[in-house]
Regions:
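Carbohydrate transferase catalytic cores enriched for Leloir-type hexosyltransferases
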Residues: 1-364
């Protein structure tokens, strides 16, 4: 019996150099037990480049930005051409732009993965010109099946788009199951790690209120953040707090990020909402205790392997981060719980269940 053929399009590999969604599709491409085609002309994606099996022209970030307009048009034309051919069993678009509905041959099924519902839950942070909700709704409504990456995402899909429950499969993300020791960064001896964006529903400002309170009592404590560069308002916030000299920003690659987790007192995740929360698993693999919000999908993913707090209550955050900064017994307990928990989340299992979803569509 011949293997299925699945077609991924260009969208996420055009948008992300690094990032959770492109990592998800990269891992599926590596692990799926089927033929995977990728329609992509030009990319700056790190994962494809590092694999040694990049099916597109790779450009460094700077020339890629200069040529962004023409590249977007070219990648779109490459995907449209491949989709029209129809020589695949399943089409799996890598993001929500419904451009493909005009060129997908009649009768060719597609599956869509929904990674979160933050545009629907927090429209105030995305502006009136935001197209994402309309795009997502159209793409989801016409899909043969939908993959949700958590129970919470499934519930939000039903709530906002009235999707029939039986049309949705829950398939968790995975993570590589080995820690890679690295020691290339010079880091402070004692720090809290914050990973990712800091705007709006990410709830960084509330966390910083708690951190500031603790750092004024513990003069050795630092904060390290990854993600986008500081905004002017953040720099002013740090200056006003009197803690600027103990706050660092690092734009970390995968190896450096591993070291940041490995040497941190704790990783903090104060977000009000996430579709899944890959950094939780990253912390577990790297033996880093986690203090996190008790909202959204976090209890679903972390279970007993986290120090929970109420994300909108600075005092609750303060108590959690204070405990993990000082209580070695609790830190060790959470490190061991995290190592046990993370074994449930492998890319092999993600790929296996995704293949089962494809089979449901083909057999319908």
């Amino acid at each position: 019996m011949s293997k299925q053929t699945v077609l991924f399009d260009h969208q996420t590999f055009e948008m992300q150099k690094f990032g959770g969604i492109s990592r998800y599709f990269f891992e599926l491409r590596q692990k799926l037990d089927c033929n995977v085609k990728l329609s992509l002309g030009v990319t700056t994606n790190h994962y494809l480049k590092s694999s040694g099996n990049c099916p597109a022209l790779y450009l460094p970030e700077r020339p890629y930005k200069w040529l962004k307009g023409p590249i977007k048009k070219y990648n779109l034309s490459v995907s449209q051409k491949e989709i029209r051919k129809g020589d695949y069993d399943i089409f799996h678009p890598t993001y929500y732009n419904p451009y493909f509905l005009d060129v997908l041959p009649q009768g060719n099924p597609y599956v869509i993965t929904v990674h979160d519902m933050n545009h629907e839950l927090f429209p105030q942070y995305f502006g009136n010109a935001d197209k994402m909700t309309a795009w997502k709704k159209e793409t989801v409504s016409n899909a043969s099946r939908i993959i949700a990456i958590s129970q919470r995402t499934k519930a939000d899909l039903i709530r906002f788009f009235d999707v029939p429950e039986e049309k949705i499969d829950i398939i968790y993300h995975g993570i590589a199951q080995e820690m890679i020791p690295y020691n290339g960064l010079r880091l402070p001896e004692k720090y809290i790690l914050y990973v990712g964006d800091r705007h709006g529903y990410k709830n960084f400002a509330t966390f910083f209120e708690a951190f500031s309170r603790l750092a004024h009592k513990d003069k050795a404590l630092h904060l390290i953040c990854t993600g986008k560069a500081w905004k002017k308002a953040e720099i002013k916030l740090f200056e006003d707090s009197g803690l600027s000299d103990r706050i660092m920003h690092i734009r970390a690659n995968d190896f450096e990020l591993g070291q940041l987790y490995q040497q941190a007192r704790l990783f903090v995740y104060p977000s009000l909402y996430e579709g899944f929360g890959i950094p939780i698993l990253e912390a577990y693999i790297n033996k880093c205790p986690v203090a996190l919000s008790n909202a959204s999908c976090f209890p679903e993913v972390a279970a007993e392997a986290g120090e929970y707090f109420q994300p909108e209550n600075p005092d609750s955050i303060y108590q959690s981060i204070k405990r993990l900064c000082s209580d070695e017994e609790r830190r060790l307990e959470l490190i061991n719980a995290g190592l046990s928990r993370v074994r449930l989340f492998t890319w092999e299992e993600t790929a296996k269940k995704t293949l089962e979803t494809y089979q449901k569509v083909i057999n319908r």
